UniProtKB/Swiss-Prot annotation:
Family: Belongs to the HEATR1/UTP10 family.
Organism of origin: Pyricularia oryzae (strain 70-15 / ATCC MYA-4617 / FGSC 8958) (Rice blast fungus)
Single Gene Ontology BP annotation: positive regulation of transcription by RNA polymerase I
Chain positions of HEAT repeats: 586-623, 656-692, 861-898, 983-1021, 1052-1089, 1161-1198, 1258-1295, 1302-1340, 1344-1383, 1492-1529, 1711-1748, 1752-1789
InterPro entries: ARM-like, ARM-type_fold, BP28_C_dom, HEAT_Utp10/HEAT1, U3snoRNP10_N, UTP10
Name of protein: U3 small nucleolar RNA-associated protein 10
Superkingdom to which the source organism belongs: Eukaryota
Annotated SMART domains: BP28CT (SM01036)
Localization per Swiss-Prot or TrEMBL: Nucleus, Nucleolus
Function text: Involved in nucleolar processing of pre-18S ribosomal RNA. Involved in ribosome biosynthesis.
Gene Ontology terms for molecular function: snoRNA binding
Disordered: annotated span: 881-901
Amino acid sequence: MATSLAAQLAQIAAKSRSSLNVKAQKAAHTKSLIFEPRIAAGQSYQTIYTACRDGFEELCQLDARFTPFSNTLFSEQSQDEDRSQMTQAENKELDRRVDSFLRLVGSRLRLMPAIKAIEWLIRRFRIHEFNTSTLLATFLPYHSIPAFVTLLSILPADLPQQYKFLAPYVRSLTAPPRAAIVYQATHHREFLTAITEYTLDACRNKQQYPALVSFWAGVMTEAVNGRIDINRSGRQGVQLDNDLALIALVSKPLGDAMTMKDVPDIQIAAYMVVSLLAAKANFDDKLLSVFMEQLVIGWTAETVRPGLVCLSILAQYRAPKQLSSRVAKALLKMDDLPQRLVDASKQCRVDKLAYALVLALADRLAKKGDARGLPIIKSILLLELLQEKLGKVAFKSLLRAALKMTDEVDQDGSARKQLGSTLVLLSQSAGATGVMVRQVIEDEDYDIEGLELRLDTSFGPRRLLEDKPAEEDAKDLEVRQDPKETLEAAIERLAVPPRSVKSFLSQKSDQLFDDMCKVLLSVATDPDDLLKFDEAPFLCRQTAHDDSYYFSFYMRVWCGPYPTLIRSAALEMAKRRLKQGDCAALDLQAMIPYCVAALSDPAKKVRQAAADLITVLSKSNAEGIETAKRPIWASKQLYEQSNEQTWMNPAASRALLQEIIVPALEESVLDEEHISNVLRSHLQSTKDSATGPQLSSAVRLSIFSCITSHVVHTPLLAVKSRLLKPTNQVDSVSKATRTSLLLPLLRWWASLSSTEAAQLCERERIDESKFNQSCVNVAVANDKPGLETLFEIITNSSAWTREGLVEAAFARTRKIWSTIKSDSKLKLALSMLDLAQTPATAGSSAEFVSEEAADFLRNVDLTTNILNAFLESLQDIPKITTDSPATKRRRTSSSDHSRGVSLQATNAVKAALNKVTFVLQLVEGSKPAEHPELLQSLFVTLADLQVLRSQVGSELGYLQNLVLSSLLAMMPTYKNNKSLKIDTSVGHGDVLVQCIQKSSSPAVQNSALLLVASLANTAPDVVLHSVMPIFTFMGGSVLRQSDDYSAHVVVQTIKEVIPPLVETFRKSRRNLVTSAAELLSSFVIAYEHIPSHRKRDMFISLIENLGPKDFLAALVAMFVDKYGTTDSMVAFCKDLMNSFGVEVQLQSLVMLLDLVSDCLQPKPTLAATLFNRNTDDDQDLHKTALKELTLLPKVLSSRQLRTEVSQLAGRDDMEASKFRELYASLLEKILTLAETVKTNKALHARCSDTLAGLLNLLSIGEFIKAVENLLDRPSISLRQKVLRTLEVRVDQESNTDADSRTVLLAFLPQLTAVIRDSDDIAYKHTAVACVDKIAEKYGKKDLEAVAAAATTIAGDCCLGQPDKRLRVMALLCLASLVDVLQDGIVPTLPVSLPKALSYLSESLQGEKEPELHNAVYSFFESLAVHVPYMLTKTYIGQLLAVSNVSAEANMSDESSQARFGCLQLLANQVDANTMLAALEQNWAQAVNAGFSAVEEYLKLLATVLDKHPSTIIAKHISTLSTIFLSALDLRRNVQSKDTVSIAALAKLTEIEALINDVALKMIYKLNDSKFRTVFTQLMEWVATGLPKDDKLGKVLRHQSVYSFLLAFFDNLKDVVASYASYIIDDATAILKASDPSKMEDRELWQLVLKTLARCFEHDSGGFWQVPAHFEAVSGLLVEQLEHAAALGELPGGDLVQNAVVGLAEAAASRDHRKELNAAVLRRLRSPSASVRLAAVRCEQSLTDTLGEDWLEMLSEMLPYISELQDDDDEDVEKETHRWITKIEAILGESLDAMLQ
C-alpha cells in the first residue's frame, strides 16, 4: 500500500509544475531568452516587466493588433499574477490569450521587441512550461536563428510528445537542421498534425505571415512526398490501407486550406500539396473530383491563376470524363477562361481539363439549353488546346448535343442557333481545328442534313454573319412563334395571288421566293411532302420547258445559303424534271453556269447531285441530236436584262458540256476546286490545255463570253463569286479581255453604297472582302478602261465609304503594278503622291485612303523617272517659308486675319515637310543604288534642306539623313559602273562640308562623313578640296562619340578619304609628313576625347591608310609630344607600333631618331612644323626630344617586337637582310646621337637606355655577332655597355636553350682574352661578370673552356689586380666556377687560395670591406662543397685564424652569416682529422681574439661532433680531450690575467655553459671505458695540473670543472652515479679548505655543494649507502652549517640544507640517518645563534622531506626542541615553533605533552 502511494505521489510530483523547493523556484526564475542565468536570478518581476514592456509597446506601434494584450498579458496587474494560484478556468483563458499572442508575434521574431515581449510571458507566466507546444510551433519556422537555440536551453526536460525529437538538440544546444524537421513530419503524423493545426489556426484568426505559410508549405510538401514514397507497396491491399491513411491525414486540412478565401497564400500552398498528391499518390477519380470541387469553391481573383494550374494537374491524373457540375459552373463564371488556359498551358498540360470542361458544357447545353459555354468551347477548339483524339470526341459531343436538343430545353431556339453558328464556324475554320472538324463531319455517320435543318444553318466554307439586325431577329422570332402551317395551306396560300414573276433570278421575285423557300424548308425532310411541293401549281412544273419559273426557283435554291439537304433536293427536283421528254428539244445552256456553281459547292452531297444533273443535261445535248435548231431556254426571261445576255453557239455549248464539264465530273465531286481549274485550263490558249481535246478560239471565246455575261447579269453573288474563280485566271480569249467583258460587274459593284453591298453579302452569306477581291481582279494591267475604273475607285471620294473595296483596288493595283505601262505608272504614282499628302481628319475615310496610297507607294517598285519627278516636285518647297518674317511680324497684331495667315503659313510648312519626308523615305526605300541618276536631284534636295533648315529653325536631321543614306547607297553603283559620271563643277563637296559643320545631329554627321568617304573613293575630285575642314570638325565631334556606328563612320572616312588625299600630297612634291601635319594634329588633339575602346583600332586604321612607313613615326612622335610618356601613352604607342611588321617598326624608330636629331639642330625643320613650335625655342624642342628618347627604349622592350625579330633574324632571305640593314642603321644613329648629347645627362641616359633596349632586341646568337664587331670599336665605354648587356641577356636565357648555350660557350675564349689582355679594370670586371653568368648556366657543357677562364681569373691579370671590385667579382666568379668544374678547379687553387686568404685578412684591416670579406667566404664555401679534400690543416687553420678576427670585428649580420655559414659547411664537409687538428691548433688564437671567436669555435666543434659518428669521435679522443681540457681552463686563463668586468664574467659563464653542452655531445658518442679514462684524466688534471702556490688558478680551474660536473651529473643522472667516487676526495678537500666568506672560494664552494646534491639526488643504485662513501661526506656536510650560518644574507646558505637533505634521502639507512641527525642536533646547542638557526632550518627541511621516517628519531630530538623553545634568539625560537608545527602536522598530535 505504501509503495503504491509513493509511486502515485512521484507521478504527481513529476507532472506538477509547482514546486515548494526554493532552489527549484530560483532555478526556474533564471530561465530567460535575453539574460544570463546569473543576471536573471537577481531580477524582480518589476524589473523584468519594465524592460519587456518597452518591447511590447514597440510591437503595438508596428501592429495595432497587439494593443488589446496591453490590458491582459502586459497589464500592470500581470506582475502580480501567479499561474500556480489560478483556477483551471483562469489558466485555460490565459492559455488562449498566450496562444493568440504567440501566433500574432510569430511574424516579428527576428525583431528584438518581439523577443522582449515573449521574455515577459516566459518569466511571468512560464509559457515555456505551460504552453510549450505553441511556443515551439511559433519559433519553429525560425529554427536556424540563435533565438531558437536559446529557447531550447530553457525548455523543460519533459517535452511534448510531438516535439520529443528536439531532445538531442536541447542537450547539445544546437539548431535542428531542416532535414530533421522534415524527417519528423514524414514519419510522425502527430508532429505534422501539430504544425498544420497551428498554421491553420493562425490563418483562421488572420494571424498568418509569409514565413509561417512558407515553412508549412515546404514541410507539408516534403512530408507528403516522403510518406507517398514510404507507403508504396506491391500488395494492393496494403497500398489501399496506406492511401486511406494518407487521405485521412491530409484531406481535411488541405480542404480547409483551399477554402480560406481570405488567405491566398495558404490556398496556393495547399494547391502545391494537392498537385503533388495527384501526381504521385495514384488516388481514384472520386477523391480527385472532391479536391477539384473544394478548389473551385475557395478560389478567388488572387488565387485563380495558380488554382487553374492545380485544377489542370488534377484533371490530368483523372480519367478523361466530364467535370462535375459545380466545377464546370465555377469555370463558366471565370472571365477570359480560354486565355487563362493558354497561360496555364505554359506551366502544365491543360488538355484533359479543357476536354472535361467541353464535355460538361456540352452536357449542360443538351440538358438545360445553357449556351453560355459555347464561346468557351469554340475558343478551346480553335486555340488547339486539345489533342486531336480528344478534340474529335469534344466536337462529337457538340454534335450529339445538337441532336438531343428539343423545344423543351430551348423554347425560343436561340441556343440551337448559337450552336449552329459555332458548329459552322468550327467547320469553316482554318488550320488543324478546321481539318479535324471537317474530317469528323465526313467520317461519322451523322445526319448532317437533318442537323442543318434542325439548327437552321449550313456547314460550308461561307462565313456566317454573326450579327443580324434586330428587326430580323424580331421577325424570325415571330415566325417561329406562329403556329406551324400545313403544306396544303401553304400551297393554297401561294396559289392565290396572280403570278407576275417570270424568273426567280430577278430582284422582283425576292419576297415570293422567300415565302416559297420557307415552305420548301418545312417539307425537305419528308420525301412525300417534298414531291407534293414540287408538283404544287405555284411552281408551274408542267410548263417548265416553256418558261423559266420552275427551274429558276431551284437554280436559286441550290446556289443559295441553305442547308445541304435543301440544295441537293433542288438539284434532284431539277434533274427529275429534265428527264421528261419535253425538255429534250431545248438548249438548256442557261443552266450550265449554275450547274458549274453547284459543282463548286463545299458540300459533297450537293456536288454529287449537281453531277447527276449535268449527266442528264448532257444526254439531252448529245452530239447525235440536232442542236442547231434548238431554242435557247429562258433566253428572254432569265434575267431582267436578258436581252443583253450573251449566249453560246450550239458548238460551244456542246463543247462546254461534253468536252469540258462531263469528263471532270468525277473529280469535281471529290474536290470543289477542280471544276474551276478545268475551266481555266480550257479557256486559256490551246497549247496550255492540260488534258482533253483542244478547243478552237471561237469556241473558247463563245464559252468565255457566255460565262462572263452570266457573271455580270446573275443577281446571285454566290454564282458570281464561283464563276469568277476560273474567269479571273484567264486574261483574255482571242482578242476579248476579261476586263472588257467583266468591267460592268466591277462598275456595278463599285456603284453600290456600303449598306447595299453589305446587305447583299449578308443575304447570301458571302464574305464581302473576298467578293471585293474577286471583283477588282477583273482589271488587268494592259486594259486602260479597267485601270481607269480602279483609279476611279481609288480617287473618287464617293467610293471611299467602301473601305474594303478601296483596299482591294489598292491591292489589285499593287499586284499589276509591274506590268503597267511607264506613262500610266508615272501618272498613277503622281496621283498616289497627291492622295498620300491629302489633308484628312483622324479616323476619316480620307485618312484611310491617304494611308493606303502611302502604303502603296512604299510597297511598289518606283522607277527612276517617278522618283525623279517626286524629287523635282520638292524643289520649290524652300519658297514656302519666304513670307515667314512677315508672318512673325504680323503675330504681334491682335487681328484674327493675322492669326489666320500665321496658321495658314504654319500648316503649309508642316505639309511641305511632310511631303519632303515622305518622298525622301520613298527614295530611300526604293533601293537608291538602282537609281544612280537621282544623285544630282538628291544633292539639290540636300542643298535645299540647308536653306529650309535655316528658315524653319529646325535641324531637319532626319530629312538630311534620308538624303545622305540614299546618296551613300548609290556610291557602289558609281564605283562599279565607270560610264556613270559625277559632275565635279556643281560643288557637292561644299554642300557636304556645310552639312557636316552646321548639323548638330550625330547621325547626319556620320552619314555625311561616310558619303565623303565614298565620294573620295569614287570621285575624289568632288570632295578632296574640301576635306581638311572635315577632319578638323571630326576631331571635335564624331571622334568623341562612343557608339559603334560613329566608330564605323570614322574608320570608313579614314579608309576612303585618306589614301587619295595622301596621293594628292605626293603629287604636290612637298614633304609628305609636313603636308599632313594639320591632319595628324586634328586626330592627336582628339585622342583624349575618343572612347578608350575605340582608340587603338581607329588610329591603326589611320596609319594604315596614311602609310605606316611614312607616318607611323610622325604620329607616335606627336602623341608623345602632346601627352608625354605616361604609362598609358607609352602602352598605347607600343600597341600601335606592334600592330605593324618589324621592318616598319625599325624604319619608324630610325625616323624617330632623325626627328630627335632635328629637334636638337639649331634650326629645326620637320620637327618645328610637326610639333608646331617656334624654331627659336630650343628648350621646348629639347624637352620634346627627351620625351621621344624616353619612349624609344620602352618600345624596344616590347615582347611582341622581340618575338617577331627573333623569328626574322633566324632567316637568311631578303627580308632578314633588310632587317639587319635597318638594325645597323638604327644602331649607328643611336650611337651618333649618344655622342652628340653626352653633355646632357638626361638625354645621354635615355640614349644609353635606348641602346640597351636595341641590343636586347636580338636573340643571343645574333646579338653576339653584333658584339664581336662592337668589341673592336675603340670606345671602351661602349664595349663595356655591350658586355653589360650580354650579362643581362645571359641571365635571361633559358638553361635548356641549346643554341644559346653553343653561342655563349663559343664566346667564352673571347671573354677570357678580354680579361687577360685588357688594361681597363671596369671592362675586366664586366667580362668576369659575363663569364660568371655563362659558366653558371652552361659551363658544364664545356669544362675545358671554363677551366681556361678559371685559370685566367685566378691569375695575376684578374684576381691579382689591386682593384677591390675586380677582386670581389673574381672571387665570386671562381665560386661559381667551382660549382661548375668541381675537381677541375684544383689546378687554380695553389694560386687562388693564398690570395683569397690574404684578401680576407686585408678586408679586416683598416676600413673594412664586407663585399671582399663575403666573397672570400663564398669561395671557400664552394670549395668545401665540391673539393673539401683540398682544404688542408694549414688552409683551414689560416681561415680559422682570420675568422677569429672577423668574429670580433663587429661585421654586419650579412657578413657574420657568410662567415659562420662557411665555417659550418667546413665543419660538415672537411675530414674530422683535418678539422679537429685545425681546431686544436686554433684554440689559443680564438681565446686571444675574444669571446665571440670562442663562441663560434665551440659551435664549430659542436657541429663536428654532431656530424661524425661515435667511431670517428672515439678515434680522436686524444685531440678532443686536449681541446676539452683547454676549454675548461678558459676561466683561469681569462681571470688570472686581467681584471674582468661583470659583463665579461656573465659572458664567460655563458661560454662555460656552451663548453659543457659541447662536452656532453662528445660524451654521448663515447662508451664508458673511453670516457672513464678521460674523466680520470680530468680529475687528475684539476687536482695536480697547477703549482700549489697558484691558489687562485686552482680555484678558477675547479670552478670550471665543477661547473662541468654539475651539468654532467644533472644530465646523465643515475647512469653516472658511480663516477661520484672520483670526486669525493677532491670535493671534501675543497669543502674543508674553502672559506665561503671569500668571494673566490664561495663560488667554488657553492658549485661543490650543488654537484654533491645532484649526486645524492640521482643515486638510485645505493652508492651513498656504502658506509665509506657516506662517512666521507656526512660529517663534513653538517659542518658546513657553520659556514652557511656565517654567510648570513649572502646567497648559498640553503645549499648546505639541500645537500644534507639529499644525503639523508640517498643514505636510506636508519643508522646513517641517526648519525646525520646526531650531527645536526649537536649544532642546535652551538653557542652561535646563527648556527643554531641553520641547524633548526636544516631539521625542518629533513622533517618536510623524510616525514615519519625522520621522526622515528623524535625521541632524540625532543630535548633539543624543548631547549630551543626558550632560546635566547627570537629567530631560533620562531623557527623552532615552526618546526614543532610541522612535526605535529605529520604525527597528527600535539607535542606539548612530550615536551613537558
